[in-house]
From Swiss-Prot:
Keywords: Disulfide bond, Glycoprotein, Phosphoprotein, Signal, Storage protein. Induction: By steroids (estrogen). It comes from the Eukaryota. Residues 1112-1123, 1187-1198, 1233-1247 have a biased composition (Basic and acidic residues). Glycans are attached at residue 1094. Residues 1536-1714 form the VWFD domain. Disulfide bonds join 1538-1677, 1561-1713. Residues 953-974, 1095-1320 are annotated as: Disordered. Residues 1101-1111 have a biased composition (Basic residues). This is Vitellogenin-A2. The serine-rich portion of vitellogenin encodes phosvitin (or two phosvettes). It is assumed to be phosphorylated to a level of about 80%. Precursor of the major egg-yolk proteins that are sources of nutrients during early development of oviparous organisms. Residues 1126-1163, 1205-1232, 1263-1276, 1309-1320 have a biased composition (Low complexity).
Amino acid sequence: MKGIVLALLLALAGSERTHIEPVFSESKISVYNYEAVILNGFPESGLSRAGIKINCKVEISAYAQRSYFLKIQSPEIKEYNGVWPKDPFTRSSKLTQALAEQLTKPARFEYSNGRVGDIFVADDVSDTVANIYRGILNLLQVTIKKSQDVYDLQESSVGGICHTRYVIQEDKRGDQIRIIKSTDFNNCQDKVSKTIGLELAEFCHSCKQLNRVIQGAATYTYKLKGRDQGTVIMEVTARQVLQVTPFAERHGAATMESRQVLAWVGSKSGQLTPPQIQLKNRGNLHYQFASELHQMPIHLMKTKSPEAQAVEVLQHLVQDTQQHIREDAPAKFLQLVQLLRASNFENLQALWKQFAQRTQYRRCLLDALPMAGTVDCLKFIKQLIHNEELTTQEAAVLITFAMRSARPGQRNFQISADLVQDSKVQKYSTVHKAAILAYGTMVRRYCDQLSSCPEHALEPLHELAAEAANKGHYEDIALALKALGNAGQPESIKRIQKFLPGFSSSADQLPVRIQTDAVMALRNIAKEDPRKVQEILLQIFMDRDVRTEVRMMACLALFETRPGLATVTAIANVAARESKTNLQLASFTFSQMKALSKSSVPHLEPLAAACSVALKILNPSLDNLGYRYSKVMRVDTFKYNLMAGAAAKVFIMNSANTMFPVFILAKFREYTSLVENDDIEIGIRGEGIEEFLRKQNIQFANFPMRKKISQIVKSLLGFKGLPSQVPLISGYIKLFGQEIAFTELNKEVIQNTIQALNQPAERHTMIRNVLNKLLNGVVGQYARRWMTWEYRHIIPTTVGLPAELSLYQSAIVHAAVNSDVKVKPTPSGDFSAAQLLESQIQLNGEVKPSVLVHTVATMGINSPLFQAGIEFHGKVHAHLPAKFTAFLDMKDRNFKIETPPFQQENHLVEIRAQTFAFTRNIADLDSARKTLVVPRNNEQNILKKHFETTGRTSAEGASMMEDSSEMGPKKYSAEPGHHQYAPNINSYDACTKFSKAGVHLCIQCKTHNAASRRNTIFYQAVGEHDFKLTMKPAHTEGAIEKLQLEITAGPKAASKIMGLVEVEGTEGEPMDETAVTKRLKMILGIDESRKDTNETALYRSKQKKKNKIHNRRLDAEVVEARKQQSSLSSSSSSSSSSSSSSSSSSSSSSSSSPSSSSSSSYSKRSKRREHNPHHQRESSSSSSQEQNKKRNLQENRKHGQKGMSSSSSSSSSSSSSSSSSSSSSSSSSSSSEENRPHKNRQHDNKQAKMQSNQHQQKKNKFSESSSSSSSSSSSEMWNKKKHHRNFYDLNFRRTARTKGTEHRGSRLSSSSESSSSSSESAYRHKAKFLGDKEPPVLVVTFKAVRNDNTKQGYQMVVYQEYHSSKQQIQAYVMDISKTRWAACFDAVVVNPHEAQASLKWGQNCQDYKINMKAETGNFGNQPALRVTANWPKIPSKWKSTGKVVGEYVPGAMYMMGFQGEYKRNSQRQVKLVFALSSPRTCDVVIRIPRLTVYYRALRLPVPIPVGHHAKENVLQTPTWNIFAEAPKLIMDSIQGECKVAQDQITTFNGVDLASALPENCYNVLAQDCSPEMKFMVLMRNSKESPNHKDINVKLGEYDIDMYYSADAFKMKINNLEVSEEHLPYKSFNYPTVEIKKKGNGVSLSASEYGIDSLDYDGLTFKFRPTIWMKGKTCGICGHNDDESEKELQMPDGSVAKDQMRFIHSWILPAESCSEGCNLKHTLVKLEKAIATDGAKAKCYSVQPVLRCAKGCSPVKTVEVSTGFHCLPSDVSLDLPEGQIRLEKSEDFSEKVEAHTACSCETSPCAA
């Protein structure tokens, strides 16, 4: 019963809404008032906005069933451009009049159940007006469900079919229904929008979860009331908000707000008169895009005569770039592009005919044509190319940009396809290449609009690839693959697989570069079908038969597909397996995973997490490999407040067989919250570069030894040599992921180019033309213009007008050049380009280069009739004019340039950014307005304002409301109250005067932004910003005629020292070096006789002054301590006595009671006072201190380490009674400070404490007096505390010095006072004037030539000593006027672990000084580098600046992630410690006078590889020998060295082989395995002396034997004995072979053959190949390819199972019986019984084993592992004589005996 009642109630409730759908009267005209407002700007008041307002009456009457007429009456349009809400709307009469004719025409629409159907409008009504109708009818769209009050649905509207929520409220008393409807435009099933310019961009879907650039929503409120005829819509109010922000949303956003009101006025009798014309169906409510797609939002132009307008703009552009670029030139160029878009084919032909022969106009027109992108423009470009009216370069550039800018429609696509097939395009390879690549891009853009790419679109590219493959044209194959990569369509995968190894048998025969191009072609396809591409790439990556470079490229492409965790783990598993056989691939994979795992970009978070997990599978020691192995380096950043980031990546692919990288790829990628793009990518491939760099054309195949070596290798087991390499250099460039150009240069092209440059220019047309243009001078102007960016996103507003977000950027580069060249001697008829390097060249030139970049971003309404919105303009203008005369003499290594002085002010760089509110309408273009968004008002600075009472402020607010009364405060006021804000204004001006050059360099900065409204980055960017870098002439005493800069290097550098010669007379003439040295010493004030005396006196005076200050501070400290003790009488007597006893016993216990590090903590300072036993010492005289120093220094010099101990004890005793020691120690070097005994460091702590302020002293005395501890308890506390020492308090231990440096190290690590003095003294002795023994290497002179002949300027003289063990450089900068000012720089590498530098300046370089030291060592247990800088004296301005900057250092360090503690560190000193905690992280400690900060595990952008040892798979400690050994280490790592000593062999890759060689048989130690076979080195044990080795070297025409006989060295060359008396020996023929005596043996070098050095002394052997032989050797010494894990490669390329098996594989059979080698390789049968599948079997070795010859028995044997293949026992196997390999699979491995020495019954020769 209850159910029946409930059902009846529900039925009754539903019946109440049976007729609530809105209807219109069938007999009357319904009249409504309609008002629509669109405002663009910022939500805060007081800022400018721009918008439009439409007022009208709307009449609706019935036409037929479910069909109504709509007519607009009395339309009125108003514009708003001003400060909101103060300024009023202004009536736009002309625009109203222009639109009234169309707006007042009736329209018909279908309407049923509250839903709007199709709309019918007259054909002559524009789409803009039709969309305004849609905006009105959109208010009538309402869907009412009878049984629900709250419901969601996807509803049709102007913006598409989007998610909508309804809430219905009924007012039964008033018979009204209120409906609230909200629409989310971010959640649409079918959204109406249009995006232009991002066809090639990658949209970031995951970023929308973090931030949305555009967000939009609308809300509607309906008031419905029941009438006799039904429910009537009484009022509809709508409000739409579009929020736009390029940054994070929390930083604010610009808004576009649409408000609509449709209010019922009443009804009137009658019906609307049906129109006489037929109405056209314009579709449903959805917005229809019209001509606004071709209308730029930054211009509004009438284009009735585009040809004439284009001519006018062209003339304007050309005239504006005659001398310099005018500010409006980029905007004019965009106007030209807009006019070309409006031009038809005939207009374009007329323009070309008019300007084709006028160079500057022609260039400008050709710059704009491809940017237009219309069908007519592309068609016209095709005609120009077909008619051959363009040069090859013009045609290639035009095609490249035209196809990328053309709208991807059907007609444009068809024209592009026809253009590619045009015979004139195919005629020129450059044009054809550009056309094919651009066509691939067009296919990509065209097919992105379709569900699948049609076959006919890809057919030209597929046919090109197939035809090129059939003909074997590798360059065309590469071109087709690159174009298919640009297209990026999955339909091309099968075509590309034909060129991928593992998918096609023919692909394995293709060059590696073709295979890698095929892999790279899959990268863009992966964006469409990542799963399929991942499958293909993973197969290639896992295939061991594929070349390593191709596998690395597959790995690169795989990670670009952003695989999941499963795929990443599979990749890591493969890399882990390959780490034993292919270190290049393993290193590349590991470094790529490591780099990705550290990425901070949110787009890559899932991939970074997957890589982090997968790295656990790999061996971390792979990160320890050096840069000889393939690497991936990545640096990225992402700022969430900007919602933008960037990543720079470099992929370095090395090869085991080459010295140089075979491929380098660098790319820069940008990330935004909307898209991500590869802005630029550059790839360079090099193959066989070593062959080309050798610069020789030696026919090694013609040498007799080449044939001999070829015969020998045939006897090796299945020998496989290296494939030949054809020298080739290729490169490509990509923009936004699309390849736009590539080139290939083979050896022939490069050699022909070099030959052409060295031959007479008359033989080569191109060289002759270039030289003629250069020598005859260049006069002209060059200008290029680009529209570098066009991005547009258009969405409809609820009003029916298009809202657009756009970004445009245009750039103009201009250069006016006027040059004249003179060459001495005058070029003759046989003059070549290379002779310019031996001539004297004078260049007189005047250039005026300038660049102007204009960026415009807009947000607002953009229609063909009117525009309104916000516009951001950013301009960067650089203008660098120069007039000069340059002299170049390469023979004398002299360069000089002269330029006149600056006569007028010149703005070098100008940057301006402005934000406007703009309105324009087509009916009245002159009324266009631009208003600054942040008004320029005269508001006072907030600091100068006065407090005012409330009454006045309220009055002002009332007046503001009255001014905006027209807006209707109830309907449209944005805020309840309006406040006035002063704009945020900042300015900065600074000028620097360069008096010597007579110029001022000024910087002017000014910003006027909206940060006072909301202090975020977005509001800081809104407003006006100006930056100017200006150069102005400065007043000087005498007029400057010209400025000169001269650089001279080499032997004639000394003759240019102006202080030594009279410029007018003897400049440039050679001078005696002694005179040069003496004169320069006098100029610099270097007088050896007075130097030590002056410095000693200066030191003593400073020391006395320090002692006086120190004594006064110590007395004050003692008095203060007594006061504190008397004030704290409550302390226990035991505490007092124990404190005093601690003080009295401090001298005896100082060595066991070191002070702890200082701390800002109160309690830590108290404990530190307890542990410092030296704080109450009394001082002694400074004279005693000085005597101790001198005595200690003398002892150190005489006795070395012995003197060290004596000086330490002496100085310790001295320091216990002298306060000056602590003063001295504060200025000691950083290296001694942390390594000296604890008691000396305690002196430093006391010194730092006594220099603290008075308030700090009181705190410390309180802590001291209130503590009680004995010296023993102090030591005990220290022992407990030292186990918890802070990281930054660890000691830096310098690297142990070699024997030669121990003496200096002992001095530096002695006591503090001795260390200070001896260090300074040592540095004075080391800083010898290099001019005493070396001429200057470089002289740089800058001078101003004045009309009064007064010298003015500077000169720098550089000396360098790099031949000695201590490399040193000295530079002196002198004022060439009569002043004594100079600056002196001295840098020296003291030892392999330490370098020092000093900079002194002032009068004779004696006023100011800065010292620096860099040294390596250990910080804790980590290898570290410490840099110390101290400044004994610096200018006062520097001090004041340092104090100001120092206040911000703690905060800045905190913001950068550093942690720290306030500590009293050494004054006037900064220390930086970089400790390597892993190859990719380091710990940083920075100590400045008042602060210690540190950063743990700071990530390095690239790994710092430490030593990798072949025998240990662990991280090796780096030597950090960076100062002297780095070049040698690099060369050693590249070159490699093979060593043989007794039975120990060390290969090129550093693998030790502890195996004896078989007796009496030659083994191939090393040979050239390239097809050239230039050399072979053989070795065997000596017959006569088993401890010695015999060496045989075959190369060129020489067969060289080296051996020991009767304990004497013997050598034969081509069987002719050469005694030691005839050494050194050098061949007369080329290539050269040289043999010279070295120690007890000889050294052979033949660099042209690939032998850098071969050293032999009978017992040991060392062989070092040349660099270019990297990876080209084989033999027992290995391949020299750094692949240590597969070092045991046998001649057939397989890897041996053990070392002995490996050595035996390289043994050579005897060529004759006299050699005594009785071993040979033989297949053996396994003796023991083997059963397979339960049946007996006999097994044979797959590979031969070394056995004695027939008739000989083994004397020595070893066990070797070999593989066996088994056969059934009843199967016979015939092994022919001499067969050395069984072509069967290996069933198992077993150890068998191999013979290494044999005994024969009869001599083989006798047989």
